[in-house]
Every structure is written in structure tokens, then in C-alpha cells.
Amino acid sequence: MTGGGTRLPVIGGVQPPAAAPGFERIAIIGLGTLGGSLAAAVRQAWPRSLVIGVDTRDVIETAMRLHAIDVGSDDLMIAGDADLVVLAGGVAESARVLPHLADAVASEAIVLALGGGSAVTERAGGLPGRLPLVLGLPAVELRGRGIHASSADLFRGRRWTITPITALPEAVERIHGLVRAVGGDPVAGSGRRPGGQADAL
């Protein structure tokens, strides 16, 4: 149609491009309800990002069948090229993994721990400067356990308390972008640096 007529949508036409991902390679360590939900939500929000899962072989196989991750392994070294590492296996597991991240992750990456506590923050000082740590506490109600209870919509409309531990504002803002991308609402928590007063997270 020419002139000033109305342009009708073309069926099967070119779709608008997906939003540019805030992170290119996201490694999620622990694919339970939280980790699996975050993996699925990230794949929806940022389809061009590579989502890497780290868990037991059985869980990795299930996550692959559910299309929650792109690749996975029970070996932490698969996270070596990640630019975001998410610790989603619970406080005790996060504290256990933290000392091994410097050897496993070769490049610069932001480390996001889902949940916190002294067991995690006290080990933050052992991380090199290229691995800044942020705590993220999503206000969600879990209705089950494990990867089968995960949902890409778990974080939609939910508040996240974001607390920098060794991270600078630029890294924290990137985590805010992640939270917004999966439908959440990031709010600032009071930071704690190693040797300072602990947060009530």
C-alpha cells in the first residue's frame, strides 16, 4: 500500500532482536530450585548467552532435558571462561566452592552468591580482585526442592536484596541488570567487606 495508508504487520516477518545480554557466559553452580530457575530465566531473557551448569551428573542430565542450561558438568573447571559465576547450592556449598574459584575461573568474572552469611563473607578475602563477590537474596517462596521444582517465572515481581562484599559499584549495577532481566526488583543491601561488620542476610 502506498501513500499515507496504514502499514499492516507482516505475518512471519522479521522479529525484533533479542535484548543484548548483560553477561555472555553464565556459570551456575548448584542446579536446585533456585539455580535451575535462574538458569531457565536467563535462557529466556538472554537467549544469546551461554548458560553453564555445574552439579552432579544426574542433575546435569535432567537440566539438559529441561532445556535449563546449554552445557554442564560435575567439574568446576567448565566455568573457566564464565564472566558471571552464580553460587546457588546453599550457604555451606558456596563456602566450600569459594576457595576453588580462583583456580577454576581463569578470566575476570563477577561472583554472585544466592544467600549469604559469615561462612561466605569470611572467605571473600581469599578471592583475587578479578573475582568480585556480591550477595543476592531473592524474596521467593520455594514450593519444592530440586531441578524439577524450578521455574523460569520464579523471580518475576520478586524483590532481591543485593549486597556488595568485595564488588565495586559497576559490578553491582551489572547484577542489578541481571535481576531486572529475569523479572526481579533489585534493592540495595548494606555491604560488608572482609574484616567489617557482618550483614544480616
Residue ranges and their predicted role:
Residues 2-75, 80:
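NAD(P)+-binding Rossmann beta1-loop-alpha1 motif at the extreme N-terminus of oxidoreductases
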Residues 18, 76-77, 103, 125-126, ...:
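Short secondary-structure boundary/capping segments
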Residues 23, 69, 82, 108, ...:
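Short, well-ordered alpha-helix to beta-strand connector turns
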Residues 75-110:
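Rossmann-like NAD(P)-binding element
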Residues 88-90, 115, 164:
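Glycine-rich, N-terminal phosphate-binding loop of Rossmann-like dinucleotide-binding domains
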Residues 96-142:
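Glycine/small-residue-rich loop that forms an oxyanion/phosphate-binding "nest" at active or ligand-binding sites
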Residues 125-189, 193-198:
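Rossmann-fold dinucleotide-binding core
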